[in-house]
């Protein structure tokens, strides 16, 4: 098992695909990392040399904020928006879309399941 940034990578996948399992590293960034370290994209994780694994691990830790650190950073940014009482903070607090999307229709994922109120007893 190869463990990078606190995450175990699947051994049978190509390296560029497997790096996507790390939160904060997408397809573009994984290829940039492999180009920088001169590792072939088509290499399987199980075929990586110990030195290559160590180089990838060190490069990611030195240059990128990933996994739990990135999640914490994002959460702190949202908390800051809520504390300063900004419009975006209010939208986060009310669990509504933040970036100007309409809410009269759609936004079902963010707002939750529609509930039908039974008014027979009233």
Curated annotation (Swiss-Prot):
One Gene Ontology cellular component: small ribosomal subunit
Domain of life assignment: Eukaryota
Function: Located at the top of the head of the 30S subunit, it contacts several helices of the 16S rRNA.
Span of the signal peptide: none
GO biological process: translation
InterPro entries: Rbsml_uS13_C, Ribosomal_uS13, Ribosomal_uS13-like_H2TH, Ribosomal_uS13_bac-type, Ribosomal_uS13_CS
The keyword rRNA-binding is annotated on this UniProt entry: yes
Keyword rRNA-binding included in the entry's annotation: yes
Name assigned to this protein: Small ribosomal subunit protein uS13c
Location in or out of the cell: Plastid, Chloroplast
Record's keyword terms, sorted: Chloroplast, Plastid, Ribonucleoprotein, Ribosomal protein, RNA-binding, rRNA-binding
Molecular function per GO: rRNA binding; structural constituent of ribosome
Organism: Cyanidium caldarium (Red alga)
Assembly behavior: Part of the 30S ribosomal subunit.
Gene3D superfamilies, A to Z: 1.10.8.50, 30s ribosomal protein s13, domain 2
Protein family according to the UniProt entry: Belongs to the universal ribosomal protein uS13 family.
Matching Pfam families: Ribosomal_S13
SUPFAM superfamilies for this protein: S13-like H2TH domain (SSF46946)
Record HAMAP family: Ribosomal_uS13
